[in-house]
UniProtKB/Swiss-Prot annotation:
This is Probable beta-glucosidase J. InterPro entries: Cellulose_deg_GH3 (IPR050288), Fn3-like (IPR026891), Glyco_hydro_3_C (IPR002772), Glyco_hydro_3_C_sf (IPR036881), Glyco_hydro_3_N (IPR001764), Glyco_hydro_3_N_sf (IPR036962), Glycoside_hydrolase_SF (IPR017853), Ig-like_fold (IPR013783). Coiled coil: none annotated. It catalyses: Hydrolysis of terminal, non-reducing beta-D-glucosyl residues with release of beta-D-glucose. The lineage of its organism: Eukaryota, Fungi, Dikarya, Ascomycota, Pezizomycotina. Pathway: Glycan metabolism; cellulose degradation.
Length: 864
């Protein structure tokens, strides 16, 4: 078939198709044909559908040399907006981006829980709170589905760390599993009915999630009545019969490892019944039917979208995600430091000022249409002549990508030439260049991070082949330059024919390329300004390396990454920044992490900022206490200077428009309204998962149980650095007239009972602004039969108000969700009778109202 817009598979048609499928055809439908596509059965009109990563943008089918895409702010940034309408609109944009990439299924959103601050993929998820996560996911999925594309909730469940992620068993109590880790999925399914759910890599209580009948058959499909498709994470299938019988419909990617002949054998040996096979086939066919709404042709060419209205939406999202953590008074005029004055000269300092930290690493990463650095955003707003830059220190973990600074030898275009060979290079101890080998492929590229998982060529069979990277580098100034080569495979880097980096002879295992690569090996070379220096990399794919990795996913041919920059004297650079800051009234210091530090494939070893960063911030604040500190990270970092800083922003990874979003908030074009979706501890040891985060002998104990994030800090009376829900504004708000009304308080079926929480919100300041009203419920401590958190978020709403404007905000919450805990003895939710308290919390520590809620009868319930 050429197009999915002709697919018409109603229930009767699907029954008919199943009856006409051969056994081999049925089996083929249950796995991918390649990295991103499902099998087609042309004789029966069953097309292939295309999937694409990921949660913050539609990358398309190519990690390697891919087509640029729109990049949304990361998951924690979207969670910080507390804006359901905005997230719905971003979902619509994602659907349009999927269609531009010829994709029918989007592999997002990610709704795992940040039980600690170190998770490599923590930036992908919305929040440490399951209600915020679930409601945000429902809005996201609704927006994607509104555009005719199928969203995928991932990863079911407890994929909360990267360390040994395919081997580790998350040991979690049934209560914590239900109240914290499954609840986001439950709420998202209740609110949006997304067409697909992806299972996680890890085990849950000893059994891999992708073959867990308890998770897939009993809870997801049985209790919740979920009717969509269940697909594996990529290479996250571990069995034949167990996975099929548990309810895993689609193994990805292809070619299959556990379906195909192995599944045929399981059928003939009665380990899998044909009835069960037909159930799995039906779900795949229903997924194809759902995907037909997109009207995207099969194997459509990938294209760019990059519309003006999309850029405006992305800028709005970037600005609305920035959290104003502190805004004390200026020593000079007794007014709040922010917003800044665009007419004044602004000094911009720091490692994140002149780089685009727009997304985290791993499957969430993509090649953006464009990026905006904080320095660029500020210069565009104030004028380049009003902005001065000082580096201060570097913040990279791996050296900055070199590709865009290279030029091709043949034409002088930006980038380099990438040649692929089936033959290895001639054995030699010296530089030989490309030699007499004939390349089977030759590409012009600019991105010098080349992950080859989805590279293909007719003359390449298997994962073993070779490649060269060649170009010239003309540095702007003379000096010692540092170069880095990271590989999942083997690699040698030559500069002007001299071996500078050997990442082949002796290799050290690292975390690159989803955990299958090496550490970055570095070397130095003196370069002359204005001279064209020859850069050449000799690369062999992953099978040419003898490195062994445990507990990680293997991605075939591997990849290479080439970085480089001028070597920096950090002490001298900090001193230069301090001298400039002492002479400037308006200073912005941009620090933080990037996709080097936060990525799928590994967890952070600590919460600290990169070396030199804290020294830079402290030194600048000593001479300019009014300096504004901007932190970019997807999850919490330590800020030992936070008490000293007077103005502080948390800016996350803001997508394409990150720099503009930061500048909009700094200069008051956007009034900050975001709130922290995560608790920021003062130090790593303060967080509740501190003693039990990594895998130990194949298991990780969720020892904090239900006391994740703010639930722990409230219970332990431990004040963190910044609490969940914290975020300031340039205006002021006042809450009043809290009212709580319950419908059907005595109904035997608690699903007939609901709460209506209403509160009056007034903008009492001089600027337009948006207020986020958070609704918490406090259980009755005197009558609870089990220990419970002090309070739990149950709903929220965001409202935009002009100065002096007053509006009523109303939030509906089912009574069951508002008052229940998971009763392990009864295997059900229990809403106990007693006197609860409903809190409405706004901006500011004292802006809280409380109202009683009397639950008259105890009731149990299951399902959605």
């Amino acid at each position: 078939m050429g197009s999915l817009d002709t697919v018409d598979m109603g229930q009767r048609a699907i029954d008919q198709i199943i009856s006409e499928l051969s056994l081999n055809e049925k089996v083929s439908l249950l796995s991918g044909v390649d990295a991103w596509h499902t099998f087609a059965i042309p004789r029966l009109g069953i097309p292939s559908i295309r999937t694409t990563d990921g949660p913050n943008g539609a990358r398309g089918t190519r990690y390697f040399n891919g087509v640029p895409s729109a990049c949304l702010p990361c998951g924690t940034a979207l969670g910080a907006t507390f804006d359901k309408d905005l997230i719905f609109s971003l979902g619509q944009l994602l659907a349009a981006e999927c269609k531009a990439k010829g994709a029918h299924v989007l592999l997002g959103p990610t709704i795992n829980i940040q039980r600690g601050p170190l998770g490599g993929r923590g930036f992908e998820s919305f929040s440490e709170d399951p209600v915020l996560s679930g409601l945000a996911a429902a809005s996201y999925c609704s927006g994607v589905q509104d555009g005719g594309v199928v969203p995928t909730l991932k990863h079911l469940v407890c994929n909360d760390q990267e360390h040994e992620r395919v081997a580790v068993s998350a040991l979690v109590t049934p209560r914590a599993l239900r109240e914290i880790y499954l609840l986001p999925f439950q709420l998202a399914i209740r609110g949006a009915r997304p067409g697909a759910v992806m299972t996680s890599y890890n085990k849950v209580n000893g059994l891999h999630a992708s073959e867990s009948p308890g998770l897939i058959r009993d809870i997801l499909r049985g209790e919740w009545g979920y009717e969509g498709a269940v697909i594996s994470d990529w290479f996250g299938t571990y069995s034949v019969a167990d996975a099929v019988n548990a309810g895993l419909d689609l193994e990805m990617p292809g070619p299959t490892r556990f379906r195909g002949p192995a599944l045929m054998h399981a059928l003939t040996s009665n380990k899998v019944s044909e009835k069960t096979l037909n159930e799995r086939v039906r779900k795949v066919l229903e997924l194809v039917q759902l995907a037909s709404r997109s009207r995207v042709p099969e194997y459509a060419p990938e294209r760019k979208l990059n519309r003006p209205e999309d850029r405006a939406l992305l800028r709005r999202a970037a600005g609305e995600s920035v959290v104003l953590l502190k805004n004390d008074k200026n020593d000079n005029n007794n007014s709040p430091i922010l917003p800044l004055d665009r007419e004044k000269k602004t000094l911009v300092i720091g490692p994140n000022a002149d780089i685009a930290a727009y997304c985290g690493g791993g499957s969430a990463s993509l090649l953006a249409y464009y990026t905006v650095t904080p320095r660029q955003g500020i210069a565009d707003k104030c004028g380049a002549d009003q902005v001065v830059f000082s580096q201060g220190c570097y913040g990279h973990k791996e050296l900055p990508l070199l590709g865009e600074h290279l030029r091709t030898i043949e034409t002088g275009e930006p980038g380099y030439t990438f040649r692929v060979y089936t033959e290895p290079p001639a054995a030699s101890g010296s530089f030989k260049g490309n030699g007499s080998r004939k390349p089977v492929d030759e590409l012009h590229m600019t991105n010098s991070s080349a992950f080859l998982m989805d590279y293909s060529h007719p003359q390449i069979s298997g994962d073993t082949y070779y490649a060269t990277l060649e170009g010239t580098l003309e540095p702007p100034e003379s000096g010692v330059y540092e170069f880095g080569l990271t590989v999942a495979g083997t690699g040698l880097l030559y500069i002007d024919g001299v071996l500078v980096v050997d990442n082949k002879t002796v290799q050290r295992a690292g975390t690159s390329f989803f955990g299958i690569g090496t550490v970055e090996e570095r070397g130095e070379r003196y370069l002359e300004a204005g001279k064209k220096h020859h850069v050449f990399v000799e690369f062999g794919t992953a099978p040419t390396s003898n490195l062994q990795h445990h507990g990680v996913v293997s991605f075939g041919p591997g990849g290479l990454r080439l970085g480089g920059c001028r070597k920096l004297d950090t002490d001298a650079a900090i001193q230069q920044a301090v001298q400039s800051a002492a002479q400037t009234d308006q200073v912005v210091v941009c620090v933080g992490l990037s996709g080097d530090w936060e990525s799928e494939g590994f967890d952070r070893p600590h919460m600290d900022l990169p070396p030199g960063t804290d020294e830079l911030v402290n030194a600048v604040l000593e001479v300019q206490p009014n300096a504004v500190i901007v932190v970019q990270s997807g999850t919490p970092v330590t800020m030992p200077w936070a008490d000293k800083a007077k103005a502080l922003l948390q800016a996350w990874y803001g997508g394409n428009e990150a720099g503009n979003g930061i500048a909009d908030v700094l200069f008051g074009d956007v009034n900050p309204s975001a709130k922290l979706p995560l608790t920021f501890p003062r130090e790593l040891s303060q967080n509740p998962s501190y003693l039990s985060y990594r895998s130990e002998r194949g298991r990780v104990l969720y020892s904090e149980d239900i006391y994740v994030g703010y639930r722990y800090y409230d219970k332990a009376r431990q004040p963190p650095l910044f609490r969940f829900g914290h975020g300031l504004s340039y205006t002021t708000f006042h809450l009043s007239d809290l009212a709580v009304r319950e419908t059907a308080p005595y109904a035997a079926n608690i699903k007939e009972s609901s709460l209506r929480v209403s509160v009056t919100v007034s903008n009492t300041g001089a600027r337009p602004g948006a207020e986020v009203v958070l609704v918490y419920v406090r259980p009755p401590p005197a009558t609870c039969s089990v220990g419970r958190p002090v309070r739990e978020l149950k709903g929220y709403e965001k409202v935009m108000l002009q100065p002096g404007e007053t509006r009523e905000v109303s939030i509906a919450i089912p009574v069951g969700y508002a008052t229940s805990f998971w009763d392990e003895g009864c295997d059900a939710w229990l809403s106990e009778k007693g006197l609860y308290f409903v809190e409405a919390v706004g901006t500011g520590e004292c802006n809280t109202l409380v109202a009683p809620l009397s639950v008259q009868v105890s009731r149990m319930w299951n399902g959605l």
